Amino acid sequence: MRRIWLISTIFVFALVSLILIAPLTAGSEPHLARSIYGGFALLCHQLPERSYFIAGHKFAVCARCTGVYAGFAFTFLLYPLLRPLRAIDWPPPVWLVLAAVPMAIDFGLTFFGIWENTHTSRLLTGLLLGGVSVFYVMPGIAELATRKTRAKRPTFTLASSESMASAPSDYSAPDRRI
């Protein structure tokens, strides 16, 4: 199970590193940067006014999504210190909902013009939701990795000549059809 966790952690950090690789390569490798931005555009609005910048180029995702990805990655890294890797039980769903509440409040207050959220508030609410979501994803990975019972393929045998004998037919008497 540790091996699966290690491979998953490398994958998660590789994905998160793309958020920083996009702006760092935007000047020197625009095709690579455009591909990364395009991939993350399917998941994030990427508005410049809501994104962090490096070297004059915006991150591949907004500040809130940066928080979600970063929170997920760092909690994923710390997960073995917090729970057994083989644990396949999920926490009650209410914890995931509660982790999303600050994000919803942050969004809602801005949407209704009560206050203007900041990069920091977006990042922090994203960190919280991303960190909590690991506790719902990792048990699924653990369950898939530790599943030992696989459906066995059915075995086929040739039928004996007795079982292949034909049954009497009712077609000789039309009034007794099934």
Language-model segment annotations:
Residues 3-30:
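N-terminal signal-anchor transmembrane alpha helix
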Residues 58-73, 120-131:
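Membrane-interface loop-to-helix entry segments
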Residues 58, 85-86, 111-121:
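Membrane-interface helix caps and helix-loop-helix hairpins in membrane proteins
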Residues 146-175:
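Short, highly charged, low-complexity non-transmembrane loops/tails of multi-pass membrane proteins
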